[in-house]
């Protein structure tokens, strides 16, 4: 399936280049290293790391953030992040992912979230920090065909060719299991990525075995790192 995904995407891209006479409307976005610098500047401006009082909410957020940033230098693999609601999990997980991706020359960060309202909230936060052109929302409520200005995003949604992708459980696992070439096209761009499952406990129990099997395969054989996030134990 990984080889098939490469072939399908290459075929689509070659056809697109031929039809456009070599001119591309695609914008792959900013390099991960530069995005990490953008986040660093954001944290400095917002003074996220300055509060070191453990008996305050902001102090605990800073502590969690520092720990996640420190863990970003660890070797690739499987990770778990358990942070109660209000603990700054969104920023902390992004900080880990960007530092980890920069340290290991990884291609992109993929957030997998069960609810579209949370996707929209998180994607907006990421856009404010990293820039609109670097964050792709990929779910059923998004329509990139309504404006010519959104054409690069429409093209990126076909194969997830952006540095930060925010998507649903359904879209992510369809890319891994579905038989349609249009779904499988994204698969090779999942390799060598940091994959963050927010609210990981929401994966349906009846689907856990195959889902965990492919997640472990991505980490073991395809250079990805996986973070399982939850606000509950």
Residue ranges and their predicted role:
Residues 1-50:
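N-terminal accessory nucleic-acid engagement/regulatory domains that precede
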Residues 44-82:
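Conserved pre-motif I regulatory segment
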Residues 83, 140, 199:
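The Walker A (P-loop) glycine that initiates the GxxxxGKT/S ATP-binding motif of P-loop NTPases
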Residues 105-129, 142:
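Conserved Walker A/P-loop ATP-binding site and its immediately adjacent core
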Residues 131-177:
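Inter-Walker segment of RecA-like/P-loop motor cores
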Residues 170-173, 183-221, 226:
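SF2 helicase catalytic motif II
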